Amino acid sequence: MSYRELIAELAREHAEEFSDALLELGALSVSVEDADADTPDEQPLFGEPGLTPDRTAWQRSRVIALLAPEHEPAVLLTAAANEIGLEAAPSFTVREVEEQDWVRLTQSQFDPIKIGERIWVVPSWHDAPDPEALVLELDPGLAFGTGSHPTTRLCMEWLEQSVQPGQSVLDYGCGSGILAILAKKCGADPVYGIDIDPQAVESARHNSERNRAEVTYGLPDACPTGEFDIVVANILSNPLKLMASMLSSKVKPGGRIALSGILARQADEVAQVYARWIDISVWREHEGWVCLSGTRRESH
């Protein structure tokens, strides 16, 4: 069985309600993308906890709807346009989508990832390219963190260079557990991972068991008291600023902290908040994202 993919471009103010109308009229799925993606006019668009996004769609939005064989694209498009009061239906193209083995197709899109000097992140359906390397077995899943995002990569490279055997580590905002697992494999002990999402905590526990890495996970109310040799938090800039006092207090005097999920243009603002307790600066930048690193001062 083959499906059809309807692709239309709309102005920002119509994209969301047009997508909703397509779903109501029977589209199997709808996604919205930046019509200027991979061009100089591409626009980043995301929100952070505690902040309201200033936009909910791109200036030129591409709406992509997957249609069952019985749906006529032009008829569906016209009906959706009428539903939201457009004077005319937008121009569109149609692409045939053949039935596929979606599991196999998805797996083919995820290869082992080399990070730093000796780290490999390997999906379960692949063999490690270098058996002597520091291997983390992780499958793409519901929790953030498989090593492909620049911020995860930056934190992993920092941990590889920073963790010494026997040091205590706190991964705040642990997601999939990838950073906590890496810290453990680098010799840290004990290692704790904290996340606000119960599903992420369960995912992290599963990943730690698969990697035979002993890490204690929990929600924020289970965060251990006391201080750590190393604290790492790969979240976003606004939550990092809001939690600056708490995260800084978790670092031992003389201990180190790494922060990411920060765009390069946000680095100074985040660093200024932490400067009250931490001697902090940009450690490394990658693809427009940065990792801040610092040491807690002995006098605080």
Curated annotation (Swiss-Prot):
Q: Specify where it is mainly localized.
A: cytoplasm
- What EC number(s) are associated with this protein in UniProt? 2.1.1.-
Molecular functions (GO terms): protein-lysine N-methyltransferase activity
Q: Name one Pfam family in it.
A: PrmA
Q: Name one GO biological process term.
A: methylation
Q: Where in the cell is it found?
A: Cytoplasm
Q: Which reaction does it catalyse?
A: L-lysyl-[protein] + 3 S-adenosyl-L-methionine = N(6),N(6),N(6)-trimethyl-L-lysyl-[protein] + 3 S-adenosyl-L-homocysteine + 3 H(+)
Name of the featured protein: Ribosomal protein L11 methyltransferase
Q: Which organism is it from?
A: Paraburkholderia xenovorans (strain LB400)
